[in-house]
């Protein structure tokens, strides 16, 4: 009806009244429900045909304001009549049976519905919301060629996307940057060239420490949205890429690539300003935050640098001696809340971090991380002097102090020197009667917590260290170490006098007495070089 007439719009000028039917209030009251429904269907059909030929673009110039309002879903005399006579029924759209709470929502939905339905391809029955996309689809459906990039043959939807306005080259701007490797955006921090403004923004976030993307469930922040997406996959347990060398799984191929560098020791990411290389880009970012002036917080006392003010604030308490977090069980105080939380687990016995390999549980996540290396064999801390590797940083630091031969911590009673203050504190207990670690089962006390842990296995019968050769188990690791020498034949403790070797240091000490006149055990007038001979005499 209307569709055929509208094709001749360019020749004949018309008014809104040519396609619209209107009633007075008196005439409207004479219509029954069926007639009113018919009227509404006819008007909607007319509107559908108008949208089909993109008639909305002509409304502003050819039709009056009331007519525009009707076709664009705004208030008109027809809509007012429907509102008066139908009331709430106006908001139930009869085409898709969707109910809407507001009249404005109905108008928007009606316009979207008919536009979607009218932009429908007769060839493949696909429907489109926008006439421009529908027009493009019709071109591809009839075999019309789209404009292509003359270097990679990528097709684009419109010529204006393809032609560069500055050079008039037949090449899409984004595609042009890909082929020419153009990098017009330069980071002021690292002087790196970047292909787009979005890449520049991400680079600025890395240097500034900005992390705008937050995971609501785990309260973690990320510098860009892709990192947040990968993190969410990790939390869901999705792991896709596996290392062929060690079997470690990763959620992203880029993570696997970074991990492979740990096997090959390749350090491809270099910072231009400082000349230092890194295997992982996050390590570079961390290094930058610590080295770049103006983007960190410095302690005035010792010069130590921090990436955020809260960490600096906690550090300052080391100098002031302030410990605001106190344990209500034993009175021990800490500089930060995390230290108190970890300490409380020593009273409650809580060990929330469990190893999935052997089931062993730990009070701190860092202890679990170190423990996992005993299963994987990973030793990330390697000494450059002798090549010896360690599973944790504390062992590595202790080892590094052995090379210069410096032992700054001296015992005032016996003169023995130590490389760490903690070792000296432990040693001082050998001069005193202090035994702070007591067994709850039998009351026996020990100088060191490790000795108490070993002792408890006597009560529990636990023997976690098992020989893979013969199956014999031991309660302490040193017992397994000594036992393994019976299989390997190793005798590392050798006498400098006669060359005789032993599997244990205690055996060597006892043997050395045979070369000296030392006989410390005295009973019944006789002297003995070792306790076993004394036992036989008794």
UniProtKB/Swiss-Prot annotation:
It comes from the Eukaryota. It is found in: Nucleus. Its main location: nucleus. One of its GO terms (cellular component) is nucleus. The keyword Nucleus applies. A zinc finger (C2H2-type) spans 91-113, 119-141, 147-179, 185-207, 241-263, 297-319, 325-347, 353-375, 381-403, 409-431, 437-459, 465-487, 493-515. Residues 14-89 form the KRAB domain. One of its GO terms (biological process) is regulation of transcription by RNA polymerase II. Keywords: DNA-binding, Metal-binding, Nucleus, Repeat, Transcription, Transcription regulation, Zinc, Zinc-finger. One of its GO terms (molecular function) is DNA-binding transcription factor activity, RNA polymerase II-specific. Belongs to the krueppel C2H2-type zinc-finger protein family. May be involved in transcriptional regulation. PANTHER family: IP01015P-RELATED. This is Zinc finger protein 559. It comes from Homo sapiens (Human).
């Amino acid at each position: 009806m209307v569709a055929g007439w509208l094709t001749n719009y360019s020749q004949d000028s018309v008014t809104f009244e040519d396609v619209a039917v209107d009633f007075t209030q008196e005439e409207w009251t004479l219509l029954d429900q069926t007639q009113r429904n018919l009227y509404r269907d006819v008007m909607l059909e007319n509107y559908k045909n108008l949208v089909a030929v993109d008639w909305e673009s002509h409304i502003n110039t050819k039709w009056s304001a009331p007519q525009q309002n009707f076709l664009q879903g705004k208030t008109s005399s027809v809509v007012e009549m429907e509102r008066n006579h139908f009331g709430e029924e106006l908001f139930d759209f009869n085409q898709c049976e969707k109910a809407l709470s507001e009249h404005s929502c109905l108008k928007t939905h009606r316009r979207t519905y008919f536009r979607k339905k009218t932009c429908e391809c007769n060839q493949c029955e696909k429907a489109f919301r926008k006439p421009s996309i529908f027009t493009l689809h019709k071109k591809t459906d009839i075999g019309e060629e789209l404009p292509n990039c003359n270097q990679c043959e990528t097709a684009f939807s419109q010529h204006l996307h393809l032609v560069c306005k500055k050079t008039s080259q037949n090449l899409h701007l984004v595609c042009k940057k890909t082929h020419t490797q153009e990098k017009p955006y330069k980071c002021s921090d690292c002087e790196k060239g970047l292909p787009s403004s979005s890449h520049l923004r991400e680079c600025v976030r890395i240097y500034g420490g900005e992390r705008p993307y937050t995971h609501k469930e785990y309260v973690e922040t990320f510098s860009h949205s892709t990192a947040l997406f990968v993190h969410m996959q990790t939390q869901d347990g999705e792991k896709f890429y596996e290392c062929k060398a060690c079997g470690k799984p990763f959620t992203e191929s880029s993570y696997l690539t970074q991990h492979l560098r740990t096997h090959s020791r390749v350090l491809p990411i270099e910072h231009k300003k400082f000349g230092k290389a890194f295997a992982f880009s996050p390590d570079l970012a961390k290094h930058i935050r610590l080295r770049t002036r103006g983007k960190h917080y410095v302690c005035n006392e010792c010069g130590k640098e921090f990436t955020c003010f809260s960490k600096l604030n906690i550090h300052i308490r080391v100098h002031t001696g302030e410990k605001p977090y106190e344990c209500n069980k034993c009175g021990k105080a800490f500089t930060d809340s995390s230290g108190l939380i970890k300490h409380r687990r020593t009273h409650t016995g809580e060990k929330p971090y469990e190893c999935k390999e052997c089931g062993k549980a730990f009070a701190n996540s860092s202890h679990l991380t170190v423990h996992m290396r005993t299963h994987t064999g990973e030793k990330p801390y390697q000494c450059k002097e002798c090549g010896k590797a360690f599973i944790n940083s504390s062992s590595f630091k202790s080892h590094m102090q052995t090379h210069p031969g410096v032992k700054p911590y001296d015992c005032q009673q016996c003169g023995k020197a130590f490389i760490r203050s903690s070792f000296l504190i432990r040693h001082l207990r050998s001069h005193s009667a202090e035994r702070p670690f007591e067994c709850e089962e039998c009351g026996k006390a020990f100088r060191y917590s490790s000795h108490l842990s070993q002792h408890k296995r006597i009560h529990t019968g636990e023997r976690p260290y098992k020989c893979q050769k013969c199956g014999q188990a031991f309660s302490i690791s040193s017992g397994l170490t000594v036992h393994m020498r019976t299989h390997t034949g190793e005798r590392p403790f050798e006498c400098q006098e006669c060359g005789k070797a032993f599997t244990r240091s205690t055996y060597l000490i006892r043997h050395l007495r045979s070369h000296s006149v030392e006989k410390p055990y005295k009973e019944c007038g006789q002297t003995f070089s070792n306790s076993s001979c004394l036992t036989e005499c008794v």
